[in-house]
């Protein structure tokens, strides 16, 4: 197995994970999954000083929280530990400003859609990917395929198909374009992705937004 620790700022979510674990539903072709996990609130991280340092840190916060989240966890990472931006947007530079570029990788969530619907409960809205449609793409900033990138890809493949990419920045801009065509439109209309696709008017707007991006 793999020793995983979740660290979150939402007290209700931390408490639910501690007492009930995590439940992932709606996984087409894979059923539902429930598993106990270790969860810490951000106010509890000081206790990590007595433990083995982290070998891999996944930064999975909103872009505006990237820098402080990295600063918070950096003291508890191994000297050779790496930091993976598992986020939308381009946040690798913010992470590198804290720990240095040599320790930073990026992971684009290409074809995996999910939402946290309640504390400790995640609904997945996309099927598992495969070699024709990768769910995740991880890469180094310099574009080389490295042993650590391959190791992390194998770990992430427990959640979805994962490919090591030599074009991280291309993956990032592709995802940004995808988000630009739909996220703002969804916020303005209150419609989900499926409803936007089904609306002829929204489809036209989405195409024009993608063209602008």
Report residues per predicted region.
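Short, glycine/charged-enriched secondary-structure capping and boundary segments
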Residues: 20-22, 71-75, 97-101, 118-123, ...
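Active-site-proximal catalytic alpha-helix in oxidoreductases
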Residues: 169-197, 201-213
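Residues at the starts of beta-strands that form the adenosine-phosphate
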Residues: 3, 82, 103
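A non-catalytic, amphipathic alpha-helix used as a structural packing/dimerization or gating element
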Residues: 12, 16, 151, 155, ...
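Conserved N-terminal Rossmann-fold NAD(P) cofactor-binding segment
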Residues: 3, 9-55
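Rossmann-fold dinucleotide-binding core
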Residues: 52, 86-175, 181
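Rossmann-fold NAD(P) dinucleotide-binding segment
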Residues: 47-98
